[in-house]
Amino acid sequence: MKHKVKNIHFVGIGGSGMSGIAEVLLNLGYTVSGSDLGSNAATRRLIELGAKVTLGHAAENIEKADAIVTSTAVKEDNPEVIAAREKHIPIVPRAVMLAELMRLRRGIAIAGTHGKTTTTSLVASVLAEGGLDPTFVIGGLLNSAGANAKLGTGEFIVAEADESDASFLNLSPVIEVITNIDADHMETYGHDFEKLKQAFIEFTQRLPFYGVAVLCIDDATVREIMPRISKLITTYGFHEDAQVRAIDAKAIDGHMHFTVLQEGYAPMQVSLNQPGMHNVQNACAAIAIARELGVADHATQKALTEFNGVGRRFTRYGEISLPAVNDKPAGTFALVDDYGHHPVETAATIAAARGAYPGRRLVLAFQPHRYTRTRDLFEDFVKVLSTTDMLVLAEVYAAGEQPIVAADGRTLAHALRVAGKVDPVFVEKIADMPATIMNIIKDGDVVITMGAGSISGVPAKLVQA
C-alpha cells in the first residue's frame, strides 16, 4: 500500500531534524513539499533538490499531500495540521518517519543528552571512509558532505535518536550509542530523573537480540543503568574498565592526540581534527562501531584525522581582523561558534577552547535557550559561566515558551555578579550583541558565540564588522 503515498509534506521543513528526512525522501523518489515561517540554508538546499517550499503555514499548502510530517514544535492549531485532520490525511510525527526510513536499512541510533550530532557525524564519516556508504540523518550540517543528510547505497543508516520528547522509543536500530544522560527536557518526564533513566533503558530494549548497546562508561548515570540493560554491551571512554579505552589524550594545535586500547586489537594512534576531551569520547564511540562492523583501523584513523566537523559544533572561523578604534590598537581575534545550550555542553566547549587556544583570554557570548532550562539548571549555569574570562550574556531565547519569573537573562546576570567571578555584560536585544562584543574584545582574544537560538546569526556579523 505504501506505493500509493507519493507526495509527502513537512510542516516546519526547515528544522534540522525535518530537513534531513525530507532530503532522504527526495532521493528515494518521493515528491516532497513543505512549509516554514522563514527561509534558511536547509530550505534553500531542499528547493535546489526539487522540493516545493512555501513560506508561512496555510491549509492550501497540503492540497496534494498524501501524508504530512510534523515535529514536536508544530502545534495542534497549525492550519496545515487542522486541514490534514479534516481531510483524513495521515499525520506522521518526525520520529515515526525516521523509524520508517530505518526499517529500510540497518539502523545505528545515537542517543544521549550531549554529543549526539558530533558522534553521529563521526560514525557516518568513519563508515563512509570504510567503504560502507551509509545513509545518514544528522541534526547539523556535516561539513565534509555539505548536508545534514545523504542517501547511501550501503545497508546502514546512521541517525540521531532524540530523547527530548521520548520519540527515540519509536526507533528499532541494530546498534545504539548512549553518550551520556543529564537532566534536560525534564518536562517530558514529569521532572522525574528516574523516568528519564527508564526511558534510556527502554531505548536499549528496542535492540534485537543480536544488537549491541555502545555505552560511554565515563558517565555516572550510564554506569548506573548498565546492570538494568539486558542486551550486548560495548563500553567506551577514559575509564579503566572501558572496553574501547582512550589514554594519553592531549591537545596539540587544535587537534586531540590519543591512543585507543581494546582487547584483541593493536593500540590505535589517533589524531582527531577536533578539540576537547568530550570529542575524544565521541571518537571512541565511532571507533567501537567501526570495529563492530569490520572497518579497518587505518580507514578509521584517516576519517578521524580528516574530520571537518559539524555546523555550529565548535566551528572555527579562524583569526578575524580587529580594526583600531580610538586608543585600542588593531589586531586579530579567534572566533568560534557552538550550538551548546546546556551547562555540561558549555563547560565542555570552554575546556576545549582552553586546550585549543592556551594562554589566550576567553570571551564567551552566551544566549540561554528556554526559560524552563534556565530555571531548572540556574545554579549550574552560574557555576559554568563563571569560568570564562569575560561574559556577554543575552536575554533568554524563548523557543515558544512564556517568560518565567527569575529565570530570565537579567536575573542570571545578577546572580553571576553576586557570585563574584565574572562581571557579565547583559545584552537585551541580540541585534546589539555584535557591536557589544567588538567594543569589549582586544587583540589576541578568543570569542565563542554559543546557544541554540538567534545567536547563530552573530558570527557572520562579527566577520563582517
Swiss-Prot record:
Keywords for the protein's UniProt record, in alphabetical order: ATP-binding, Cell cycle, Cell division, Cell shape, Cell wall biogenesis/degradation, Cytoplasm, Ligase, Nucleotide-binding, Peptidoglycan synthesis
DNA repair keyword on record: no
Pathway assigned to this chain's UniProt record: Cell wall biogenesis; peptidoglycan biosynthesis
Main location: cytoplasm
Subcellular localization: Cytoplasm
Enzyme class: ligase
Enzyme Commission designation: 6.3.2.8
UniProt keyword annotation of Nucleotide-binding present: yes
A GO molecular-function annotation: ATP binding
Positions of ATP binding: 112-118
UniProt cross-references to Gene3D superfamilies, sorted A to Z: Mur ligase, C-terminal domain, Mur-like, catalytic domain, NAD(P)-binding Rossmann-like Domain
CC terms in the record's Gene Ontology section: cytoplasm
UniProt record, GO biological process: cell division; cell wall organization; peptidoglycan biosynthetic process; regulation of cell shape
Transmembrane segments: none
HAMAP family per the UniProt record, alphabetical: MurC
Record function comment: Cell wall formation.
NCBIfam families reported for this sequence: murC
Family recorded in the similarity comment: Belongs to the MurCDEF family.
Protein name: UDP-N-acetylmuramate--L-alanine ligase
Organism ancestry: Bacteria, Pseudomonadati, Pseudomonadota, Betaproteobacteria, Burkholderiales
